[in-house]
Every structure is written in structure tokens, then in C-alpha cells.
């Protein structure tokens, strides 16, 4: 009997206030002709079975930037309280049937579908039982991949559920994923980050 393919979903956090880029929503900034959030969502769609986008700040504009993509949308009315609330909203909306879930940031423009597929493959080959945290040259990155059984434990924590707290409290359930590039530790928070990314002539996601 052929083994069932390993099935991963992504929770894409796109609700934040872009506090470090005053006056602009960084997710709507165009990179290579498309909004940053759309570029990132397409990467996860290419590598994952399903993608759940958590909306909050300027949610209507972010949703509009994603028009036409086969995504599931989740609203986080408490987005101003910070990222943990978006994580809670995202994992609460997940359907059954996944083996693992990526908690992903929408501002990582350097990531490619190949990067994400490699992380998912490492989880599958390792038996899918541990949280995988990407590192590059000693620096901790994103996305973090959670086995679905541990997502259930996070849900049970209610308002106390937070990725970093859960990881730090359960080191025995966590493994490092040594990334081959800096894509996992590169994000766009400031105009300086954007300029550095554009100067680096990053390839389009593939």
C-alpha cells in the first residue's frame, strides 16, 4: 500500500501594525511588481496543502492584495494586542487532517517554495514528531513547523498560547533545522530592510 503523502498547512500571520515602518503597511509594499503579502502567500501555496491567512490591521486592503489566490481567511479582532493573538486565531481555524502546521510570517520576502518544501520534507523524514525551528549561522528564523498533535496542546492553553513560549517550555519536543541560506532569517521590518533586500537582487520565489 502506498503511504499517504505528508500534509502540511501554513498559518500566515498578516495582521500586524507594521510599527517599524511608520505610515505604511509593509505587507502592501510592492516587490517585483506585487505586494509583499501576495508574494509570500504564493510561496506557501506552492509548498503547502492549505494556507490560512490571519487578517487584522487594514484587513480589507490585505485581503484585496490577495484576490484570486485559493486562501482561507481568519479575522483577528485583537490584532493590536500582538502576534500571539494571531497565532491563536490561526490555529483555532485549522481543519483536521494535517500532519504539520507552519506558523509563518508574511514579511519574509526571501523565502522560496523550495525552502519551505525542504523544511516540510525534513519533518516528514524525521517522523513528524518534533517542532522544527530553522537556524542559519546560529540565528533563529521562521517559519516554525509544528506537528499537528502539538497544535492541539497549544490550543488547550487558550490565551496563554504562544509559539516562543511553547517552544522554550518544551525543549525536548524541539529540533533545529539547519538552513542552507539566510532566507529563513531575513524579513522586512524597516525601509532599510527593504533597501537591503532589493540591493541583494533576490530571485523570485521558485
Predicted regions and their residues:
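Conserved beta-loop-beta/alpha segment of the NTase-like Rossmann-fold superfamily
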Residues: 80-148, 152-153
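Acidic helix N-cap motif at the loop->helix transition within catalytic regions
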Residues: 60-66
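Conserved donor nucleotide-binding strand/loop of the catalytic core
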Residues: 70-81
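N-terminal glycine-rich phosphate-binding loop and ensuing alpha1 helix
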Residues: 3-56, 60
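Conserved alpha/beta core of the MobA/IspD/sugar-nucleotide pyrophosphorylase nucleotidyltransferase superfamily
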Residues: 2-6, 155-206
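Hydrophobic residues at beta-strand termini and immediately following loops
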Residues: 31, 74-76, 134, 177-179, ...
Amino acid at each position: 500500500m502506498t503511504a499517504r503523502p505528508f500534509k502540511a498547512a501554513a498559518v500566515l500571520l498578516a495582521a500586524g501594525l507594521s510599527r517599524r515602518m511608520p505610515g505604511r503597511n509593509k505587507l502592501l509594499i510592492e516587490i517585483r511588481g506585487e505586494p509583499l503579502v501576495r508574494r509570500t502567500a504564493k510561496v506557501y501555496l506552492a509548498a503547502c496543502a492549505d494556507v490560512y491567512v490571519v487578517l487584522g490591521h487594514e484587513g480589507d486592503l490585505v485581503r484585496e492584495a490577495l484576490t484570486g489566490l485559493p486562501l482561507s481567511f481568519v479575522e483577528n479582532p485583537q490584532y493590536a494586542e500582538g502576534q500571539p493573538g494571531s497565532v491563536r486565531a490561526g490555529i483555532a481555524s485549522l481543519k483536521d487532517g494535517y500532519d504539520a502546521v507552519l506558523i509563518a510570517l508574511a514579511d519574509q520576502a526571501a523565502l522560496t517554495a523550495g525552502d519551505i518544501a525542504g523544511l516540510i520534507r525534513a519533518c516528514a523524514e524525521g517522523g513528524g514528531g518534533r517542532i522544527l525551528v530553522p537556524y542559519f549561522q546560529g540565528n533563529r528564523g521562521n517559519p516554525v513547523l509544528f506537528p499537528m498533535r502539538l497544535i492541539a496542546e497549544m490550543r488547550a492553553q487558550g490565551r496563554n498560547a504562544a509559539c516562543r513560549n511553547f517552544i522554550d517550555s518544551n525543549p525536548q519536543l524541539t529540533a533545529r533545522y539547519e538552513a542552507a541560506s539566510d532566507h529563513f532569517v531575513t524579513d522586512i521590518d524597516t525601509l532599510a530592510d527593504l533597501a537591503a533586500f532589493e540591493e541583494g537582487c533576490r530571485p523570485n520565489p521558485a
